[in-house]
Amino acid sequence: MAKQIQAIRGMNDILPNQSPVWQKLEAVLRDAVAAFGYSEIRTPIVESTDLFKRSIGEVTDIVEKEMYTFEDRNGDSLTLRPEGTASTVRAGNEHGLLYNQEQRLWYTGPMFRHERPQKGRYRQFHQFGVEVYGIASADIDAEVLMLSNMLWQKLGLTEHVVLEINTLGDSDERAAYRDALIAFLEVHKDKLDEDSQRRMYSNPLRVLDTKNPEIQAILADAPALMDYLGEESKSHFSTLRELLDAVGIQYRVNPRLVRGLDYYNRTVFEWVTDSLGAQGTVLAGGRYDGLVGQLGGKDTPAVGFAMGLERIVLLLETLELAKDVPAAVDVYVTAMGDSCVPAAFAIANELRVALPGVRIMTHCGGGNFKKQIKRADKSGAALALIIGDNELAEGKVAIKPLRNDNEQQLVAREALAETIKALI
């Protein structure tokens, strides 16, 4: 027997019994962005490697260790996208969507990072993101946080996530702070772990994000970024907090919060949860006013966020919030004998036209009554329709409830759609 081919490590199938919770999540995401008037953008999975080197930064873990990069037959270096923001900016620049315009966009799709697979984190993962361009004021920062908050409300996760916010200031303020932080870290260099020493000069703000408790203790005495902010950055952050207070979104200021990508400035935020064990991030983002210019466009203010859908699915399943996801089938149509199959197909088609949104499956493959009802029950359908010679002769169809103890009933064919509508 030929050797069975397996999926690549860290790249998982989403099987039919798993799809309903994904479909529920995706429907919530689409409803939320529609409620805020955002437009969808779709970009290629494969991009020029330079796009991510210029946006994410060459000395980040993503570019150095995690990207899937290869040369095509023309010798061009290409990369499977590790995140969605850079591709969205590239598309906006290329098609003239960003300069002197306001754009509220969203995207979803697979991303790729070669990191150690673990529960909720995979080498191919699905990301949902929101990006807004052309608005520099703090009110749009508040809006994207309102949108993210709506997602938790619709998913029943509000009590299980916490919003953390911080400000990184502008590039000049951050540069001054960077110098002060490096000077502080140099004093304690011998006590830093290998990862912090590696980042100390290339990306010192990332040292603040360490999970090492010994380094965290050292950083307790580090200079505070807030002390290096000018009035404009302080005012921006203050306005954001006022707007969050006004709409009742609770948050905590985390002065150690930085983002893993180099392009962020001013507002940064994360929604975190401890419902998956150790505290973990389930949604993150912030403002990145310099990235559009960095990638060849005109300087354009921008803010956005992204979330990994595998983490959200895991959270829903862990909290047992995925149990109310409906079955894939509402009505299962059976035929008692080959002579009834044409009528069963015709009735199923009539119902699909009369009841849009109701999921109707027709039994195929023959079999006796017991086998067909067993299949109907296994499908998860609420109702089985029984099409038999005697019923057809009377112009009727039998409806058998499968999820309660209600009795089977005979219904005239012309009243079938309305009866089903009332029952499911």
UniProtKB/Swiss-Prot annotation:
Keywords: Aminoacyl-tRNA synthetase, ATP-binding, Cytoplasm, Ligase, Nucleotide-binding, Protein biosynthesis
EC numbers, comma separated: 6.1.1.21
Transmembrane segment boundaries: none
Any one GO MF annotation of this record: ATP binding
One Pfam family from the record: HGTP_anticodon
Any one of the GO CC terms: cytoplasm
Reactions the enzyme catalyzes: tRNA(His) + L-histidine + ATP = L-histidyl-tRNA(His) + AMP + diphosphate + H(+)
Biological process, per Gene Ontology: histidyl-tRNA aminoacylation
Location(s), subcellular: Cytoplasm
Keyword Zinc in annotation: no
Protein origin, superkingdom: Bacteria
InterPro entries, per the entry: aa-tRNA-synth_II (IPR006195), aa-tRNA-synth_II/BPL/LPL (IPR045864), Anticodon-bd (IPR004154), Anticodon-bd_dom_sf (IPR036621), His-tRNA-ligase (IPR015807), HisRS-like_core (IPR041715), HisRS/HisZ (IPR004516), HisRS_anticodon (IPR033656)
Record-stated family: Belongs to the class-II aminoacyl-tRNA synthetase family.
Subunit structure: Homodimer.
Record PANTHER family: HISTIDINE--TRNA LIGASE, MITOCHONDRIAL-RELATED, HISTIDYL-TRNA SYNTHETASE
Name of this chain's protein: Histidine--tRNA ligase
Organism from which the protein derives: Shewanella amazonensis (strain ATCC BAA-1098 / SB2B)
Organism classification: Bacteria, Pseudomonadati, Pseudomonadota, Gammaproteobacteria, Alteromonadales
